[in-house]
Amino acid sequence: MGQIEGGFVQGLGWLTTEQISWNVNGNLSTYSPSTYKIPVSKDIPEKFNVDIYEKGLNIEKTVNRSKAVGEPPLMLALSTFMALKNAVNNNNLKSPATPENILMALQE
């Protein structure tokens, strides 16, 4: 379960908080967690339901036959971004959907 939750939260950060910027020399300014905002525990949804399909075809003897489940949930975070896009009623909302980008989308 932790792999699935972690993948989703990683995607949540990618699409809502992790703003990338470069300095005047073209060097990346946001190169580590100390220079950009990553999700923290309070950013994780309070209610987070995960179900594993028990009748899958994976034969690996892992917990709940859950081999390779860490990466796909990253893309599930698109649901959050799309919900924000829908909430501001603007298809031009830029990613990451930071408060600044949301405000700009609302003002268009």
Q: Model features per residue range: what roles?
A:
Residues 1-108:
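C-terminal catalytic domains of large/alpha subunits in multi-subunit enzymes
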